[in-house]
From Swiss-Prot:
The gene is KLK4. Residues 31-252 form the Peptidase S1 domain. Zn(2+) binds at residues 40, 91. It holds the Pfam family Trypsin. It is an enzyme of class 3 (hydrolase). Keywords: Amelogenesis imperfecta, Biomineralization, Disulfide bond, Glycoprotein, Hydrolase, Metal-binding, Protease, Secreted, Serine protease, Signal, Zinc, Zymogen. PANTHER family: KALLIKREIN-4, KALLIKREIN-RELATED. This is Kallikrein-4. One of its GO terms (cellular component) is extracellular space. Residues 27-30 form a propeptide.
Amino acid sequence: MATAGNPWGWFLGYLILGVAGSLVSGSCSQIINGEDCSPHSQPWQAALVMENELFCSGVLVHPQWVLSAAHCFQNSYTIGLGLHSLEADQEPGSQMVEASLSVRHPEYNRPLLANDLMLIKLDESVSESDTIRSISIASQCPTAGNSCLVSGWGLLANGRMPTVLQCVNVSVVSEEVCSKLYDPLYHPSMFCAGGGHDQKDSCNGDSGGPLICNGYLQGLVSFGKAPCGQVGVPGVYTNLCKFTEWIEKTVQAS
């Protein structure tokens, strides 16, 4: 399944004016220098599909709710759960679910991607299993140096599509370094990870995908600087510890 085109290319010029070098949204995200995930080792991973093409990722955080990046917003969604390969028809243990209600964070700032998260309500609850399972959101904010796992189906470093879900470990970068690298775009709703000498990174096909730290959902793929996988240039993630109250209230109210 091919990734859709970059939905935020319309404001690339604005971003280039703000920061030396061009930036790219995670919404065509590739996993750089990662490897095949163990099958169904990330049972919370969701694929947001439109016209049979992956356009973003998401994370199952409740039997009827998926968390994703706000810049992935659409009027309706087909969401794949329990998937390892996007090429397999009716993969055992998988489920395709429709969704028509999504709630973007009220302070989401599209040009700058601050507060870049939204909740998508599935039309029906899913039954959790070995291949489909929700994950808890971290209540503690990330610590610099922590090793975390990011996953996705986007393009590989060689430009080819992976046949199965890809995983890569990246380290959290300090707020001081992150804010300097992405000034003036940086916002407290963001944090950085990656940018090490191993050039491991998330990048263009996977906005809204999960960053898992210590078994908890710590962040969502948001954006980064092109080309991906540069030494000293980490990717940017939505800092979910800042939004636990909003997420809980939104789920309860709907």
